[in-house]
């Protein structure tokens, strides 16, 4: 009887804790109460590690982000910063001042107009562009990935980093402490012995009950000499080249940027370097003056536990609410928060062309089931869903009207929006947006549309599994 009393006490304590800390997020509270009901003895342990935002609040207080504040006046002076809608090349934006003001005011990274971009649509193209830029580095190379494997392509990156370090180029290398947990020590040691500076980003220390395990760095950044930057969905591994038979062809999107917005990719890396290493890099040569090589308007948005605003989620929500003609989304994991979910439904019933591409086969069965749980109600409002059949689609792209497109590291899910360190580039009515739109149309041609009537007839067992996983969706 004593153990039953103990279970009851723990249950009551957990319930009170969850209701106290999660009252502002009812869906999250329901998910945790569901776990508590099913697993009362281990629920609190999981909640301790995964749910609470103590560590997040600590990171915000540290002010670890936006390290370039000391350089702000200098950087703004040497950048073509756009502060008013009249400065935009995009005539459509003059009718969307509310969204423009939101983007300007909610992100400390300004919108800049002196950029040239290149959309990269697969691993082969992306890795070639990255490695070529790295080989020509003169001052520094900054490399940061969520997943970095020691396979064939990983060794090619290693070779270039080592060669450039021996030539005197400063090479800094970050990988996430969970996403790249299996990166061999021998691989890291070889890099370090050659002069490459390496750090894990917030590696969890289970012996000390470290809550940082919930806050992962999902960013993929390469910056070369402060002049060329890369951001998008591609990690470093042979699977991103389609070399894993179980996965097959890997469809992804990355963006190469030259120009003023590289400053803010650099700033994101330096913020992460500070959190990973404790070193505050304040070298002015990390932000060299740029020769204006293009006139594309780009804004870099970063979000994570070190930020007050959930900037990427708020950008997506704001863009969806002003859409007039189309909302096209590509995402490997579709677990929208309530705001995004309602915005999609309202857009569809208002006559906006809403199309969403998701994988036919996912690399996560649990997440895939949770994603499907959102499909039927959205189909009933007029949203069109397509399942990519050519292989696995991992791109994270949002296109709204002829107004803007985003390419980045954030999935359309709650973990990316509210917990992970993420990075997104927003492009405005330029050649990059045209390329993203053309790629989306091609991806549709390699996909099958989900028919509402057929989807309604899916097996009861699948519907049950979807319901159960959806209850966990705020945690996935």
Map each language-model feature to its residues:
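Helical hairpin unit composed of two closely spaced alpha helices linked by a short loop
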Residues: 323, 333-355, 359-360, 364
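N-terminal localization/anchoring segments of enzymes in phospholipid and broader phosphate metabolism
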Residues: 1-314, 318, 322, 346, ...
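Short glycine/threonine-rich loop-to-helix capping motif typified by GTGT followed
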Residues: 342, 368-372
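Active-site donor-binding acidic/aromatic loop of nucleotide-activated sugar
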Residues: 385-389
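Catalytic-core elements of nucleic-acid end-processing and repair enzymes
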Residues: 396
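Short alpha-helical functional segments enriched in proximate histidine and acidic residues
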Residues: 330
